[in-house]
Amino acid sequence: MKPKVLITRKIPENGIKMLREHFEVEVWEDEHEISREVLLEKVRDVDALVTMLSERIDAEVFDAAPRLKIVANYAVGYDNIDIEEATKMGVYITNTPDVLTNATADMAWVLLLATARRLIEADKFVRSGEWKKRGVAWHPLMFLGYDVYGRTIGIVGFGRIGQAIARRAKGFGMRILYNSRTRKPEVEKELGAEFMPLDELLKESDFVVLVVPLTKETYHMINEERLKLMKPTAILVNIARGKVVDTEALVKALREGWIAGAGLDVFEEEPYYHEELFSLDNVVLAPHIGSATYGAREGMAELVARNLIAFKNGEVPPTLVNREVLNVRKPGFE
């Protein structure tokens, strides 16, 4: 009898097809996320679980799922999962790094460039008919934005995605600053990047890109005090997690001109956002689509399947997050 896996949202078919060869597969087909009540009911008889960032996987879920042995998170981040509790219960946790690195780095640049050059404002100006209404084809002061080439970028979080952003910055002839938990001398040498304490980085940078995981230490790390350190011409880009930024403080900074603009792909309480953000022209908003390319999402689906299949075969999953679990339980459904 095949082990049973529940996939809490429809993912690309390539991953589902791989899983069907080894598992009894149930997919939550609804466009809306699975409710907490339904999730707790459905996990009662599953051996494996494929989850999204929108699902909180904690002790309550583990207690409701006596057969559950592995959770494959369809994301790089895993702040939606209680890793300590999972390890204690002998549940393996995997994620999907690498395959979405370039797509997410590209998204940071989409937001950076769109904000710097006021692209969304300009698009609205054309679509609304205002350009035609004004009858002015071109004006020297129309939609002036900020130069990118040769400026200074500060990258907060210098893992795979942060480094990919830096490689793109090199092509723009930028000075590259970074902040992370540990220095990376080899990458500094490769990219000409400079390590800098966070507050100094904020003062020096024309563009600040946030790529850190959400932890107790990074919660609201960009607050009112730190926003005031930034240049009034600076632009903040957040592709990390919404709660890394104090949204109330950011709205105030954008409204009062402490910084020039912001590009946001993540929000504190998704799918909800601070209503005042919607009324500000100097912010570009996207609905958490950093990895939303065909290639990245298919790569994520394949990696999810590879992790589960490896576990079923008694092998350590390729992207195991909680390696301490190896001391609690061997891989496999036996």
Swiss-Prot record:
Catalytic activities: glycolate + NAD(+) = glyoxylate + NADH + H(+)
Residues reported to bind NADP(+): F158, G159, R160, I161, S180, R181, T182, I239, A240, R241, H288, I289, G290
Species of origin: Thermococcus onnurineus (strain NA1)
Active site residues of this protein: R241, E270, H288
Subcellular location: Cytoplasm
Matches recorded under InterPro entries: D-isomer_2-hydroxyacid_DH, D-isomer_2_OHA_DH_cat_dom, D-isomer_DH_CS, D-isomer_DH_NAD-bd, Glyoxylate_reductase_GyaR, NAD(P)-bd_dom_sf
Principal localisation: cytoplasm
Cellular component GO terms held in the UniProt record: cytosol
Keyword NAD assigned: yes
Protein name: Glyoxylate reductase
Keyword annotations from UniProtKB, A to Z: Cytoplasm, NAD, Oxidoreductase
EC number: 1.1.1.26
